[in-house]
Amino acid sequence: MGSLSPWHWAILAVVVIVLFGAKKLPDAARSLGKSMRIFKSEMREMQSETKAEPSAIETNTANPTPVQSQRIDPAAATGQDQTEARPA
């Protein structure tokens, strides 16, 4: 009961052929193959990019730029009193 016997696989294959038709199965397999090739090439490209990026990341984080904080008063920036800016 744990695994499928050869008869189960044969019945499953017949059902798939009946449902999808003999003509559509090669097209579907071809499309699946193309999709897998594209997926694998994209994965290889991503892996090569991640191998190249760590050196660039390490050099950028070695020299952080200091940031000066400033407090800006909204009333002084607009030139209005805070009571005038409130809705009536």
Swiss-Prot record:
Database matches in Gene3D superfamilies: 1.20.5.3310
Pfam families, A to Z: TatA_B_E
Annotated region described as Disordered, given as residue ranges: 43-88
Compositionally biased residues, Polar residues: 57-71
InterPro entries: TatA/B/E, TatA/E
Cellular localization per UniProt: Cell membrane
Keyword presence, Cell membrane: yes
GO CC annotation: TAT protein transport complex
Single GO biological process annotation from the record: protein transport by the Tat complex
Biased composition (Basic and acidic residues): 43-52
Primary location: membrane
Alphabetical UniProt keywords: Cell membrane, Membrane, Protein transport, Translocation, Transmembrane, Transmembrane helix, Transport
Presence of keyword Transmembrane: yes
Subunit structure comment from the entry: The Tat system comprises two distinct complexes: a TatABC complex, containing multiple copies of TatA, TatB and TatC subunits, and a separate TatA complex, containing only TatA subunits. Substrates initially bind to the TatABC complex, which probably triggers association of the separate TatA complex to form the active translocon.
Name of the protein this chain belongs to: Sec-independent protein translocase protein TatA
Naturally occurring in which organism (per UniProt): Mycobacterium marinum (strain ATCC BAA-535 / M)
